[in-house]
């Protein structure tokens, strides 16, 4: 090893040790229910194989951008290793693989003991390696995935393309919208079998709230637009017919669908990558730090975790090409830490910049009596309002309430220009973020104007006490930015200063996908960017 490379690797080991102490020296679970978890979901307790010491390419993360990258690399003949900190959860039509939003246990959350969601109802449980990581920063809670398949396991399934004019406003010409519209959005729609909610599902009992939502927005002068969705409608039909346990028709989604109702990445991109024989996913592999040697080879410090959080081993892996797909938070943490500690010394001044929440806000308004039992999960429709600040509202379900309350929930996405910067804390080895409380209030206010207009014209109640707030912008499920295209990277995700290093996920997006859910755009950009990378 070259002298410089030796010291860099030694530095990486020190950084990884500090990070392991900070991040998750997650305590081993003391949950007596772990024995039950082992009987319910034995698959996640199977021995975890070690990732190979060296691979042509390593992909960190297994969400939308990472999964696209793994498949397209494999198809190009490039052997790749996918590293995922979370477990690989199976699906079954009858077993309760995942916990519910209403009375969750440790399977729901990544090594935490309490959670207060959008309903503002506090819940407690014992720590375990569950699927949803709630990362708390000053001013904002960020929801992100910890499972093989990433966000596709826990999101609500809506995959919508933004309008060109708003997309261009956000991306500033770095990405050609026409190219996405003509090539990459259609490719993703085909790969993920996206389509609108069928009429029989829409008119079923669990979607009475969707029909009432549409009636109210029409009364207010809006025309609801149908959403494309990743749900497999035949699985919902099985639920309605009683030939599968209720999940997507019974307010379950944020913590996973046991019966595989969502056509998540384990059923498409990751599966297809594995079937090439040139890509393998390694669950329980948390990446703590990254470096580049003088030779150009990359070093990845990894901790292998049991579902309980116990660290089973630590190793340094190497690769020729390194693709970051750990999501806005995970990718930004790795890059900011590497820049601060000198393991990637040539990163530019834009690393850590451009974080935004996609303008997320959850709203609730009342309704007249709804003839239904519980709320179905898939979002049937949306409206867009440009009368002031551009806002999209989507028909949503109320997480954690499996019965019908008469409330109608919306997920709002506001065109919010606010951006924040990730910073490194040398004393702890952690990476932090400050989010403005004033921004929270502004986002909530912009969405509230639209929701109140609907409530007023539909004769509904705008303030709904069961949710604690009529508008809650204290969280985001759509973190974006931190390594933005055209700034920290070139226009295709190649990281400036470190050839062979790429950003392939939501960290590359400048804080917003222009008032729609980010998943379709993240996936389409990954398709576009990996195609350019492979061209050379």
Where are the regions a protein language model picked out?
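N-terminal Rossmann-like FAD-binding beta1-loop-alpha1 element of flavoenzymes
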Residues: 57-81
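N-terminal export signals
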Residues: 5-27
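FAD cofactor-binding and catalytic pocket of flavoenzymes
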Residues: 125-144, 151, 155, 169, ...
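A conserved short coil-to-beta-strand element within the FAD-binding core of flavoproteins
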Residues: 283-296
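C-terminal segment of N-terminal export signals and the immediately downstream linker at the start
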Residues: 1, 21-56, 75, 90, ...
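Glycine-rich loop(s) and the adjacent beta-strand/alpha-helix scaffold that form part
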Residues: 75, 79, 85-100, 290, ...
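Conserved redox-cofactor binding core of oxidoreductases
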Residues: 173-286, 472-479, 484
């Amino acid at each position: 090893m070259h002298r410089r490379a030796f010291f860099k690797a030694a530095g990486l080991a020190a950084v990884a040790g500090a990070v392991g102490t900070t991040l998750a020296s997650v305590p081993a679970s003391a949950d007596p229910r772990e024995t039950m978890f082992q009987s319910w979901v034995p698959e996640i307790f199977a021995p975890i194989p070690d990732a190979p010491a060296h691979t042509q390419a390593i992909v960190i993360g297994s969400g939308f951008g990472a999964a696209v990258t793994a498949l397209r690399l494999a198809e190009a003949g490039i052997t790749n290793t996918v590293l995922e900190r979370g477990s690989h959860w199976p699906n079954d039509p009858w077993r309760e693989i995942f916990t519910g939003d209403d009375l969750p246990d440790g399977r729901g959350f990544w090594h935490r003991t309490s959670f207060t969601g959008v309903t503002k109802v506090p819940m407690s449980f014992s720590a375990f390696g569950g699927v949803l990581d709630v990362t708390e920063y000053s001013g904002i809670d960020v929801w992100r995935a910890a499972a093989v398949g990433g966000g596709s396991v826990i999101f609500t399934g809506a995959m919508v393309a933004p309008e060109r004019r708003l997309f261009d406003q956000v991306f500033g010409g770095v990405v050609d919208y026409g190219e996405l519209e003509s090539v990459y959005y259609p490719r993703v729609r085909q790969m993920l079998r996206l389509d609108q909610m069928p009429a029989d599902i829409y008119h079923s009992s669990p979607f009475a709230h969707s029909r009432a939502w549409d009636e109210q927005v029409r009364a207010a002068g809006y025309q609801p637009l149908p959403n494309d969705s990743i749900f497999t409608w035949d699985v919902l039909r099985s639920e309605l017919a009683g030939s599968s346990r209720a999940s997507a028709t019974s307010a379950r989604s944020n913590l996973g669908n046991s019966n595989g109702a969502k056509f998540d990445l384990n059923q498409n991109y990751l599966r297809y990558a594995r079937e090439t024989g040139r890509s393998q996913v390694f669950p329980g592999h948390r990446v703590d730090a990254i470096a580049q040697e003088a030779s150009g080879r990359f070093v990845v410090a990894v901790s292998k975790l049991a579902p309980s959080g116990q660290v089973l081993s630590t190793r340094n892996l190497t690769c020729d090409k390194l693709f970051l797909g750990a999501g806005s938070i995970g990718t930004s943490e790795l890059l900011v830490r590497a820049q601060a500690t000198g393991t990637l010394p040539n990163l530019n001044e834009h690393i850590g910049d451009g974080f935004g929440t996609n303008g997320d806000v959850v709203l609730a308004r009342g309704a007249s009596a709804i003839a239904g039992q519980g709320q179905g999960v898939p979002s049937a429709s949306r409206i867009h309002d440009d009368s002031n600040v551009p806002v999209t509202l989507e028909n949503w379900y109320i997480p954690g309430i499996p019965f019908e309350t008469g409330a109608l929930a919306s997920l709002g996405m506001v065109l919010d220009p606010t951006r924040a910067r990730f910073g490194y804390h040398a004393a702890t080895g952690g990476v932090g973020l400050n989010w403005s409380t004033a921004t929270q209030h502004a986002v909530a206010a912009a969405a509230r104007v639209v929701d109140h207009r609907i409530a007023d014209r539909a004769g509904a109640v705008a303030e709904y006490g069961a949710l604690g707030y009529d508008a809650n912008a204290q969280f985001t499920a759509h973190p974006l930015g931190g390594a933005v295209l055209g700034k920290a990277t070139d226009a295709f995700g190649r990281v400036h200063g470190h050839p062979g290093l790429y950003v392939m996920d939501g960290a590359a997006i400048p804080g917003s996908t222009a008032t729609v859910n980010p998943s379709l755009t993240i996936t389409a950009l990954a398709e576009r960017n990996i195609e350019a990378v492979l061209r050379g």
